[in-house]
Curated annotation (Swiss-Prot):
GO terms for biological process: glycine decarboxylation via glycine cleavage system. The glycine cleavage system is composed of four proteins: P, T, L and H. Residues 24-106 form the Lipoyl-binding domain. GO terms for cellular component: cytosol; glycine cleavage complex. The keyword Mitochondrion does not apply. PROSITE patterns: BIOTINYL_LIPOYL, LIPOYL. Binds 1 lipoyl cofactor covalently. This is Glycine cleavage system H protein. Keywords: Lipoyl. The keyword tRNA processing does not apply. Its cofactor is (R)-lipoate.
Length: 131
């Protein structure tokens, strides 16, 4: 059973979102997603300063099994990326909710976060997938 921290918000496409304050949100992929993908070999992250709309593909996770698009959970501008993943993409596997974060985005509209799934709704969605 995947770990689904309650303090985070989630997307149906397995991204997590952490409110860091001042309209900045940290984004990564969930433990469930990294379990499905397997061992990460490369992370293609967005450029700092790039802007994305919610649901737009903005990064790629390459694992031993597949390359998978990562989607912007909310609209905004990329303000930071996790440079540690260049040398150590496996952090996405070993610490998906901490050291394996992908990027930080400054929201265009904070209210979009309210449309994301809470932990219970995300857990229900992955339970349904597993059936």
């Amino acid at each position: 059973m995947s770990n689904v921290p309650t303090e985070l918000k989630y997307t149906a496409s397995h991204e997590w979102v952490l409110n860091e304050g001042d309209g900045v949100y940290c984004v990564g992929i969930t433990e469930h997603a990294q379990e499905l993908l397997g061992d990460m070999v490369f992370m293609d992250l967005p450029e700092v300063g790039a802007t994305f709309s919610a649901g737009e593909d903005c990064a790629v996770a390459e694992s031993v099994k597949a390359a998978s698009d990562i989607y912007a959970p909310i609209s905004g501008e990329i303000v930071a990326v996790n440079d540690d993943l260049e040398a150590s993409p496996e952090l996405v596997n070993s610490a998906p909710y901490t050291d394996g974060w992908l990027f930080k985005i400054k929201a265009t509209d904070d209210s979009e976060v309210n449309e994301l799934l809470d932990a219970a709704a995300y857990q229900a969605a992955i339970d349904e997938e597993d059936e």
